[in-house]
Amino acid sequence: MALTQGTKRKVCYYYDGDVGNYYYGQGHPMKPHRIRMTHNLLLNYGLYRKMEIYRPHKANAEEMTKYHSDDYIKFLRSIRPDNMSEYSKQMQRFNVGEDCPVFDGLFEFCQLSAGGSVASAVKLNKQQTDIAVNWAGGLHHAKKSEASGFCYVNDIVLAILELLKYHQRVLYIDIDIHHGDGVEEAFYTTDRVMTVSFHKYGEYFPGTGDLRDIGAGKGKYYAVNYPLRDGIDDESYEAIFKPVISKVMETFQPSAVVLQCGSDSLSGDRLGCFNLTIKGHAKCVEFVKSFNLPMLMLGGGGYTIRNVARCWTYETAVALDTEIPNELPYNDYFEYFGPDFKLHISPSNMTNQNTNEYLEKIKQRLFENLRMLPHAPGVQMQPIPEDAVQEDSGDEEEEDPEKRISIRNSDKRISCDEEFSDSEDEGEGGRKNVANFKKAKRVKTEEEKEEEEKKDEKEEEKAKEEKAEPKGVKEETKST
């Protein structure tokens, strides 16, 4: 596949001003506020002038149950901090309560995250954009009927299902430090989605993503896992990422790509143990973009929030083929970026435990697996189902789409200033990075496998039954 450097491409960006108001709770490392910080920084860099900015619709239960089970979504809709005691059994069943707490507005937060990713996929399908960006998405650990690793609804799976209506083969790439287990599991038995994950492996959450996990049934060899050790740096990462992705592109020949840009793989992340700089991380974005495929860019992990905002702002600029200065512009959160107030970060002096021999050995094993694939699976033509997001449908949503949570009314969702600081004691609480092997599920039940095979069929049937969906996303005013 030919590479073309520096081609200007149309970019659509999804953001809702309310997303930063949601709050996982005292001491929890996941802070949706980082998305507001990112948005504010890229506004002050003037990047909004170069792309179309949309406010996503709130994904409804019908959209979510294209993948998730009905009872799980019903539970997420119903549970609140004030009625938790009535749901203790279900909380256990759906893995909600510790790493994935119940917080005020939980379901709305999931609706915004999923809404942005699904709307992005529809935009790409309609060829109304070349690149779509949703930094509130990328929640790759959520399972069909279970929350996991701070993720409740798997917006990535929902977006890929949408892309599959128009694209025979979709490639998913994950550069978060944690294995993209939820996405891999959803597409483990299909040859229409290839999942490629580069992640820390061994005594680390979620405990999956072994080199030998390659997919099953029709999906055998369509799951690609690159297990890594602590301390990988820019040079080593680039030396594995580029050849693996080139080989995947050549062999799988996708017509659309989804890139999960989890920024917990950066140096100095509160939960991470890699040593990438923002430039090193963004080289992955640049390389994937160079294949000139319809591309969906999503967020994900990232727990040193000043660096998350830096990273995703820079990667938005990369998507736009725009150079931005290292000197940060003044913005609403300027004090977070001290003492240097610069965009780029330096690597630490941590040891890179990934030797060249180790990386080469893994790479060769992956290449052997990729050689087992038939070149570009055959295309099966089917009627195209309806889009999930209907633009100008004429039907109003039950809720006024312009109704917003005012900052004043949502004070209880926002923590005190110290909560958002990146202080030294941040290692306490939050997701346990030591793998819980009891929960690290690899073997699927026969029932799940059957469900997976019926997914395309079910997808088509549901689409025919669908009523008109909520009105299309609206362009956001630039003043947000």
From Swiss-Prot:
Q: Which domain of life is it from?
A: Eukaryota
Which cofactor is recorded for it?
A: Zn(2+)
Key words, A-Z: Chromatin regulator, Hydrolase, Metal-binding, Nucleus, Repressor, Transcription, Transcription regulation, Zinc
What is this protein identified as?
Histone deacetylase 1
Histone deacetylase: region residues: 9-321
**Per its UniProt record, what InterPro entries does this chain match?**
HDAC_PDAC (IPR050284), His_deacetylse (IPR000286), His_deacetylse_1 (IPR003084), His_deacetylse_dom (IPR023801), His_deacetylse_dom_sf (IPR037138), Ureohydrolase_dom_sf (IPR023696)
Write out the residues that bind 1D-myo-inositol 1,4,5,6-tetrakisphosphate. G27, K31, R270
Q: Identify the gene encoding this protein.
A: HDAC1
